[in-house]
């Protein structure tokens, strides 16, 4: 029996978010906003807290700096019951941090400082600890520079060798990001990029062709998040379907894909069938979009399940 339900390794960041952002004031001027909040975010960080909120016993695996932001990230993770024993403090590095300017339509331009995420490194002595989970997730391949040089793939192989279900999300903007991502795909059960990232990597537009590209690289299944168009699932056995998005009023899209990953992990732990997993992941993402900041709108498992069952979807 694994020690954890979910181990989430990769990109952890400190976010300061304001809403609604309308303009940059000229010179040294001031524009007043209605809300300001802080959040642990990042492809691994958002997923970690969202999963913990929904009842998974969760291990955080990443790096923060020796600064106030790092202190806050660790305390915030612990406040949700997350095990931070695999979080590293990186001397000489600042914690990866963002100022997120969220518009009224939910779009969120950001100013980001890439910090300790670039330097954290999981060596072989840590493999048994960090992969001791039913679901092992790597979030932010492409942003974890020290790990992207082959170590992510080694940890993924170790996770597969001990029987974990593996999931991967990425940060990608062009085909040049593909080599770092390609190395982990043979050990990936569920590859879950956004459609924008998948298209940037492959140059393809059709959802089926895009998914097949990654299936041919070794993944068991590809789950493409489509924003307001829902999600597309396609696996090696030929099962494929699209799930529509929920009809909601969007407040902030920060962390929506990462919350989707957490919801999908919950579905794996609960042994949901593929379509229910994707629907539950969509519900988690939708709730995330209804709050300001990553995972703010996610409450608990029962709340997400009820939302999935009762909320209308888009046509």
Language-model segments: residues:
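Conserved beta-alpha-beta core of the PfkB/ribokinase-like small-molecule kinase fold
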Residues: 135-212, 229-230
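Hydrophobic beta-strand scaffold residues
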Residues: 58, 84, 166-167
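A glycine-rich helix N-cap at a beta->alpha junction
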Residues: 76-92
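Conserved phosphate-binding/catalytic region of the ribokinase-like
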Residues: 1-6, 10, 18, 32, ...
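Glycine-rich phosphate/adenosyl-contacting loop at the front of the ribokinase-like
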Residues: 1-63, 68-79, 249-251, 315
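Conserved phosphate-binding/catalytic loop of the ribokinase/pfkB sugar-kinase fold
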Residues: 89-90, 100-145
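Alpha-helix C-terminal capping segments
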Residues: 48-57, 102-103, 267-271
């Amino acid at each position: 029996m694994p020690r954890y339900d979910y181990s989430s390794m990769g990109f952890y960041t400190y976010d300061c978010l304001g809403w609604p952002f309308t303009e940059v004031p000229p010179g040294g001027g001031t524009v007043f906003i209605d809300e300001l909040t802080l959040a642990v975010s990042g492809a691994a960080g958002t997923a970690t807290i969202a999963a913990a909120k929904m009842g998974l016993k969760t291990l955080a695996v990443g790096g923060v700096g020796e600064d106030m932001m790092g202190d806050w990230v660790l305390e915030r993770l612990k406040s949700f019951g997350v095990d931070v024993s695999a979080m590293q403090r990186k001397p000489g590095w600042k914690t990866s941090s963002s100022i997120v300017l969220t518009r009224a339509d939910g779009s969120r331009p950001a100013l980001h400082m890439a910090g300790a995420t670039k330097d954290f490194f999981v060596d072989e002595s840590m493999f048994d600890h960090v992969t001791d989970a039913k679901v092992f997730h790597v979030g932010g391949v492409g942003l974890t520079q020290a790990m992207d040089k082959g170590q992510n793939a080694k940890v993924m192989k170790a996770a597969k060798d001990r029987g974990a279900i593996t999931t991967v999300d990425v940060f990608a903007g062009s085909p040049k990001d593909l080599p770092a991502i390609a190395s982990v795909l043979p050990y990936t059960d569920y590859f879950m990029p956004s459609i924008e990232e998948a298209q940037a990597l492959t140059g393809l537009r059709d959802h089926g062709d895009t998914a097949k590209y990654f299936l041919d690289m070794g993944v068991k299944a590809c789950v493409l998040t489509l924003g307001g168009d829902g999600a597309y699932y396609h696996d090696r056995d030929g099962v494929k379907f699209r799930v529509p998005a929920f009809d909601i009023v969007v407040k902030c899209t920060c962390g929506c894909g990462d919350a989707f990953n957490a919801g999908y992990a919950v579905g794996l732990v609960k042994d949901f069938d593929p379509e229910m997993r994707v629907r539950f992941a969509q519900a988690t993402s939708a709730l995330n979009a209804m709050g300001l900041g990553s995972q703010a709108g996610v409450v608990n498992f029962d709340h997400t399940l009820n939302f999935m069952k009762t909320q209308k979807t888009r046509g």
